[in-house]
A protein has these predicted regions:
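Tight coil/turn sites that cap or link beta-strands
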Residues: 19, 54-55, 63, 83
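Amphipathic, well-ordered alpha-helical segments in soluble domains
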Residues: 32-35, 118-125, 145, 149-152
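A short, compositionally biased micro-patch
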Residues: 36-38, 61, 71
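A hydrophobic/aromatic-rich effector-binding and dimerization subdomain
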Residues: 2-5, 69-132
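Histidine-centered metal-chelating micro-motifs
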Residues: 58, 62-68, 86-87
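Generic protein-terminus/edge-of-domain signal
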Residues: 1-53
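Short, Lys/Arg-enriched, Trp-marked, Pro/Gly-tolerant hinge/linker segments that flank
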Residues: 110-112, 133-141, 153-198
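Generic alpha-helical secondary structure signal
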Residues: 95, 117-122, 148, 172, ...
Length: 199
């Protein structure tokens, strides 16, 4: 499965490391979704410069040259790497096209603290799942969570294009999601529980 979930602060294994500051362009053959949890950094993406700080979301398309120009000492990011093959395997070309449009028109955006926490919880869950033994159910669960993660990015970016204050604009779906996630975390369910529900 062409997906990896990692960060730059916990020592998680990385299959594409772009965190060093050396002024040299890096290029990944996959989509990178980056969420800034702390600190700030300046990214050079092709010929444009983007600055992100806590609560900012950044999408970098596959085969796009970029590098980190500078970052603060407390710069923490969550990263999701999604290979193009995942979109074809999950039969979700609509999501792929929406992401391509957003990357071209609005690759970065600020999100509310509630959304930031939601993304971090999804990221943490996926990081654990990717360490589990791979099978049909695990892969299905990961696929669906990745789609939620990326569709939510589309939702946020679409919503805030015309919203006067994006950090105050919340939807009922977000509240419902938090309630469900909190319930699952409190009961500490195992992978087998999810598999039995699907199967």
């Amino acid at each position: 499965m062409d997906i990896s979930i990692y960060d730059n602060y916990s020592g998680a294994e990385r299959d594409f490391n772009f965190f060093q500051i050396d002024g040299e362009y890096k290029m990944c053959d996959s989509l990178l979704a980056i969420i800034c949890m702390r600190g700030s950094a300046k990214f050079h993406i092709r010929f444009r410069e983007f600055e992100i700080s806590r609560g900012d979301y950044l999408l970098i398309d596959s085969n796009t040259p970029f590098f980190i120009k500078e970052n603060s000492e407390d710069f923490h990011i969550d990263v999701v790497r999604v290979g193009d093959s995942v979109f074809s395997l999950s039969y979700d070309e609509v999501l792929h096209r929406r992401l391509e449009k957003l990357i071209a028109e609005r690759p970065t955006n600020s999100i509310s603290n509630r959304k930031l926490l939601m993304f971090h919880m999804i990221h943490s869950y996926l990081k654990v799942m990717m360490r589990e033994r791979g099978d049909f159910y695990r892969d299905l669960i990961v696929f669906e969570y990745i789609k939620i993660f990326l569709y939510e990015a589309c939702h946020i970016m679409d919503d805030t294009v015309s919203a006067p204050n994006p950090k105050k604009k919340e939807r009922n779906i977000t509240n419902q999601f938090f309630q469900l996630m909190d319930k699952e975390y409190r009961t500490n369910r195992k992978v087998e529980d999810y598999a039995s529900r699907i199967g």
